[in-house]
């Protein structure tokens, strides 16, 4: 009879393997239920046959078995929404780019300037491939480049090659790859080849296909060189110490950014007078500032660079907008400089400095050495310290003999022109809704229509921090309306007419 009972039990549990641990599991489960706790002992793992069947349909639950059966997890993992996929890829890009510090990787130490001064500005700085080899990047360039290539392949797999957001992400990943390759070639002509690919060149044409950035540089050189600044109004003396400048900027940013903790600090390692980070601005220890300088820093570093970083950080899906790959540099730097113009805070000397850097990059591309460019800056009236700093900006990372500069400084003037054209065209074609998205984060112009279109489905959040003239576009609309007419008026003929009129003044 015992054998028949065992046989019947086998029939009732047809297909199941014997389990010697079941009584112990049942006892533990009953104890957990009595104590009001969740079951802590998992059911036995199904064998391969059971697992393969459960994918198609979960096995029926035996009412005599206190443990419910659990189907195996799908091989592909849980279902993910489009926004989840984008956010995960964006997070991966942000994390992958974190150790990349372009300006840190190509900086020169103070001894270089001292040696150049001792040589009476006649000997090339001793900065070459061996010099940069001693400065670690903080990552393996080949491995980091391969990581970004894998991210680009993941984007194609997850989003497809025709997805517009995917195209932005892919371009961003591949630009970071090329940035890493550029840094891996410091001190060689290959560095310049990547720099030109990433940041452009003064020889690049504007969208009209005819006018180059160099053409703009030569035109502005003639105009700005002839401006007599003594006739323009009051002079702004640089008498404000760095700590006082930082305190004033902290006060202004507290009013502008409110609860967002944007801080201004004094830094003794800066090469420039000021620089912006994601939520901070640093001013160089020992530098002195005028009230106009502080006005410019408020707009340039705060209203644009910090604000776009904060707007990007506020994104829950489009997280890549908080970081600025080279493809966004022209819009970022040009927008900051253009806001100086819109707020009437800039001045001819500063405009000349930006334009002269374009011409200096062009000269270096055409073979001028560090000493040649340094001497050119001296002929333009800069003091020797500023000559060195301007020339260093152009040759850092490249080849001091000439022919292979760092071309980033060409982005500022190009960005002024292209941002102005973007804003004017948006107003002319009744697409003013796109203009605020210049501030949604670190963007290129081709990104803006795509990002604006994805607000409704939650992929992108509109920008929170906008400069006053972009929160209320009425003034810019009138400005651009008249600007459109002025460009069609026939500039030379009008200028000649007034030149004859001015001649009457003697």
PLM region descriptions:
Residues 159-292:
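Contiguous, non-catalytic segments that form substrate-binding/exosite surfaces or channel walls
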Residues 290, 294-295, 299, 327-332, ...:
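Secondary-structure capping and boundary motifs in well-ordered enzyme cores
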Residues 295-312, 336-337:
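Active-site recognition of the HExxH zinc-binding catalytic motif
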Residues 350-506:
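Conserved alpha-helical "signature site"
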Residues 292, 307-332:
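Post-HEXXH active-site segment of zinc metalloproteases
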Residues 322-362, 415:
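Post-HExxH zinc-binding segment in Zn-dependent metallohydrolases
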Residues 2-214, 476-480, 485-506:
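N-terminal low-structure segments adjacent to metalloprotease catalytic domains
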Residues 274-280, 307-312, 386-392:
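Active-site-adjacent bridging/hinge elements
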């Amino acid at each position: 009879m015992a054998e028949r009972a065992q046989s019947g039990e086998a029939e009732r549990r047809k297909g199941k393997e014997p389990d010697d641990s079941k009584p112990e599991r049942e006892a533990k489960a009953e104890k957990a239920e009595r104590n009001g706790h969740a079951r802590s002992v998992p059911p036995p793992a199904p064998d391969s046959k059971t697992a393969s069947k459960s994918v198609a349909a979960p096995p029926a639950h035996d009412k005599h078995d206190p443990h419910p059966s659990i189907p195996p997890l799908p091989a592909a993992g849980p279902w993910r929404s489009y926004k989840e996929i984008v956010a995960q890829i964006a997070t991966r890009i942000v994390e992958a780019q974190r150790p990349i510090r372009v300006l840190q990787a190509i900086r020169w130490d103070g001894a270089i300037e001292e040696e150049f001064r001792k040589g009476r500005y006649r000997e090339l700085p001793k900065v070459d491939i061996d010099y940069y080899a001693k400065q670690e990047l903080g990552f393996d360039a080949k491995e980091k480049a391969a990581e970004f290539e894998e991210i680009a392949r993941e984007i194609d797999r997850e989003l497809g090659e025709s997805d517009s957001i995917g195209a932005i992400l892919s371009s961003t990943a591949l630009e970071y790859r090329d940035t890493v390759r550029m840094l891996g070639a410091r001190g060689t002509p290959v560095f310049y080849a990547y720099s030109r690919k990433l940041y452009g060149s003064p020889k690049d044409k504007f969208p009209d296909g005819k006018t180059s950035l160099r053409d703009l540089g030569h035109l502005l050189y003639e105009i700005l060189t002839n401006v007599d600044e003594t006739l323009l109004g009051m002079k702004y003396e640089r008498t404000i110490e760095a700590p006082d400048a930082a305190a004033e900027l902290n006060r202004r940013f507290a009013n502008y950014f409110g609860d967002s903790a944007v801080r201004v600090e004094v830094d003794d390692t800066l090469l420039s007078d000021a620089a912006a980070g994601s939520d901070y601005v640093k001013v160089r220890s020992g530098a002195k500032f005028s009230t106009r300088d502080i006005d410019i820093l408020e707009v340039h570093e705060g209203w644009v660079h910090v604000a776009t970083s904060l707007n990007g950080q506020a994104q829950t899906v489009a997280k890549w907008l908080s970081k600025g790959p080279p493809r966004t540099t022209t819009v970022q730097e040009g927008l900051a400089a253009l806001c100086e113009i819109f707020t009437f805070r800039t001045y001819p000397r500063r405009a000349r400095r930006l334009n002269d850097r374009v011409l200096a990059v062009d000269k270096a591309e055409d073979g001028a050495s560090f000493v040649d460019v340094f001497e050119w800056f001296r002929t333009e009236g800069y003091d020797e310290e500023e000559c060195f700093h301007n020339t260093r900006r152009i040759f850092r990372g490249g080849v001091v003999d000439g022919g292979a500069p760092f071309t980033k400084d060409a982005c500022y003037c190009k960005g002024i022109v292209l941002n102005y054209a973007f804003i004017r065209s948006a107003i002319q074609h009744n697409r003013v809704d796109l203009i605020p998205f210049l501030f949604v984060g670190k963007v290129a112009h081709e990104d803006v229509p795509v990002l604006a279109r994805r607000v409704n489905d939650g992929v992108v959040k509109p920008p929170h921090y906008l400069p006053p003239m972009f929160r209320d576009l009425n003034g810019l609309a009138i400005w651009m309306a008249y600007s459109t007419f002025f460009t069609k008026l026939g500039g030379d003929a009008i200028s000649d007419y007034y030149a004859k009129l001015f001649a009457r003044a003697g």
